[in-house]
A protein has these predicted regions:
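Solvent-exposed interaction patches of small proteins and small membrane subunits
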Residues: 1-100
Length: 100
């Protein structure tokens, strides 16, 4: 579920975008490695590095959700909003864990 409030990652948005652009470069490099018939282990090493970098971005966004979105919902005193944000958090963590 999404809403129109400021996202929890707003303070680090530019840093996250920069990191995602670096990851994009890594993925393009992996594509070139395949095109150039590079050694399997070298390709897998780069895939692992890109995946780890992407997981770190995801964790930072998840942290922002907890420290801003969930915190604000709880602090508001609105039990329904707090329950909704908590449910969203649980679903996000479940999806994130499945990625691994």
């Amino acid at each position: 579920m999404s809403d129109i409030s400021t996202p929890g990652y707003a303070d680090s948005k530019q840093q996250l975008v920069t990191r995602l652009r670096k990851i994009e470069g890594q993925v393009r490099g992996i594509e070139r490695m395949l095109t150039d018939d590079r050694y399997c282990i070298d390709v897998l090493t780069q895939i692992s590095a890109a995946r780890t970098a992407l997981e770190k971005v995801g964790l930072e966004i998840l942290d922002g959700h907890v420290t801003h979105c969930v915190h604000d919902a709880i602090a508001s005193g609105d039990a329904a909003a707090a329950a909704e944000k908590s449910r969203e958090l649980l679903e996000a963590v479940e999806r994130f864990v499945k990625m691994r």
